[in-house]
Amino acid sequence: MPLLHPQSLRHPSFEIQTQRRSNSTTRLLLSHKFLHSQASIISISRTRILKRVSQNLSVAKAASAQASSSVGESVAQTSEKDVLKALSQIIDPDFGTDIVSCGFVKDLGINEALGEVSFRLELTTPACPVKDMFENKANEVVAALPWVKKVNVTMSAQPAKPIFAGQLPFGLSRISNIIAVSSCKGGVGKSTVAVNLAYTLAGMGARVGIFDADVYGPSLPTMVNPESRILEMNPEKKTIIPTEYMGVKLVSFGFAGQGRAIMRGPMVSGVINQLLTTTEWGELDYLVIDMPPGTGDIQLTLCQVAPLTAAVIVTTPQKLAFIDVAKGVRMFSKLKVPCVAVVENMCHFDADGKRYYPFGKGSGSEVVKQFGIPHLFDLPIRPTLSASGDSGTPEVVSDPLSDVARTFQDLGVCVVQQCAKIRQQVSTAVTYDKYLKAIRVKVPNSDEEFLLHPATVRRNDRSAQSVDEWTGEQKVLYGDVAEDIEPEDIRPMGNYAVSITWPDGFSQIAPYDQLEEIERLVDVPPLSPVEV
């Protein structure tokens, strides 16, 4: 039987059915593609929706985190303000300003979760006499905040650095304060005061050095007894390595070996300059210079080479000592070095329940009165004080609880406070107003300003050239001063006075305290624009 060709099997009805099936299959295929495309669209839309939702959630989370962060920062800022406000209640007695405004508060950290506050108080000197008060008060005021549970206070001091560090020799570039101890007369106990003051400052926590500037008669090798009594040289740096005793660095011509007994002035000045400027002093808070007696080349060299912060004047009750001291004070005033304290040595002794003044009294108080020096300290005739100078151990070290040691403690506090004030001083407070023809006075640490008549200021000079220092008799009479006199120059003298130069060449030292007591001008014409 012959095989039939497939086409022969086609029947119209079959073709129709096949076509129907084909159309149906096509429709099914189309429907499937449509559904698949719709599913893809739905899937894409769903993905986009999920992505959009995810983005929105991320934005929401970021916004929430930012809001939380802002709230956290706001709370932290509020907490920091609370702490600083509490600390601003503490006033520095020297500057008259709170410790926050002084810039003492450093490294403030707050942990709110634990209620813990940490900060550092950076004072101007490690020998600050009120550092314990600052620490206790800071703990107290911060702990009083309701959310604070623990307070951590760290005390520190500013790095040792002089005001004009860039203009100094390398050896002096890291010394904060240089104190001159001077008498301008030998044999009054100047070296004793210098050494005991230095070791008092060291006992208060300061880094201290002593420079014995007396080449002809050095006292330091006798008054202290270091293990190494010879100064060594650093061969690489060509600098002098100071010797040391009980933490205080020491330099003296007496430690330089056997030198010449006779030297001319220029040679001595060169030796002093070399010893002072090429020594590796390192970082010091205070360098105490034991000045040689007199007011000559050596003193001028020291004042020119070393930027003296302040001077301490040593005297005895005799009139002769007072005369030399007056010369020294005037020398320092011309060199713009403020004298911050007077030490009257060998002023009295106690015996049989009585106090005796074998050399009289009043010399130290006269210096304070005439020159406006703010502080006076008395030292008695005490055998142990002189004996300690011969034994090599200062009195303040061998007997720190003695009356003499307490006096030196008061002197040390005075020096620290006065040096801090001097370093904060910016400009003069006294000027001459040519339009009003009056001296305008603005006292430091005060908003008060007043005017003085120049002739009145000149007539109120209390120096030995105007007033006899013993009888009080006025040497310059009222008519000796012209009514229309005008000052030629007014310059500051440290933080306690000004130097006024008059047309006759006289240089008047006018302490601020004295200027405040002088009769003031009341009927002053109002200021008006001056035509140029």
UniProtKB/Swiss-Prot annotation:
Keywords, sorted A to Z: Acetylation, ATP-binding, Chloroplast, Iron, Iron-sulfur, Metal-binding, Nucleotide-binding, Plastid, Transit peptide
Q: Indicate the impact reported for C128S.
A: Loss of iron-sulfur (Fe-S) binding
* Effect of inactivating the gene: Seedling lethality when homozygous due to impaired photosystem I (PSI).
Read off the transit peptide span from the entry. 1-61
A GO BP term here is: iron-sulfur cluster assembly
As for subcellular location, the record says: Plastid, Chloroplast stroma
How is the co-factor bound, per the entry?
A: Binds 1 [4Fe-4S] cluster.
Acetylation keyword on record: yes
Q: Name one Pfam family in it.
A: GBBH-like_N
**What tissue specificity does the UniProt entry give?**
Expressed in aerial tissues exposed to light. Very low expression in roots.
Cellular component (GO) terms are: chloroplast; chloroplast stroma; cytosol
Query: Could you say which residues bind ATP here?
Result: C184, K185, G186, G187, V188, G189, K190, S191
Q: Any idea which GO molecular function terms this record carries?
A: ATP binding; ATP-dependent FeS chaperone activity; iron-sulfur cluster binding; metal ion binding
- As stated in the Swiss-Prot or TrEMBL entry, residues carrying the post-translational modification N-acetylalanine are A62
The cofactors required by this protein are:
[4Fe-4S] cluster
So what family is this one in?
A: Belongs to the Mrp/NBP35 ATP-binding proteins family.
Q: What does this protein do?
A: Required for photosystem I (PSI) biosynthesis and assembly. May serve as a chloroplast scaffold protein that specifically assembles iron-sulfur (4Fe-4S) clusters and transfers them to the chloroplast PSI and ferredoxin-thioredoxin (FTR) complexes. Can assemble a 4Fe-4S cluster and transfer it to apoproteins in yeast cells. Probably not required for assembly or stability of plastidic 2Fe-2S clusters.
Output this protein's name. Answer: Fe-S cluster assembly factor HCF101, chloroplastic
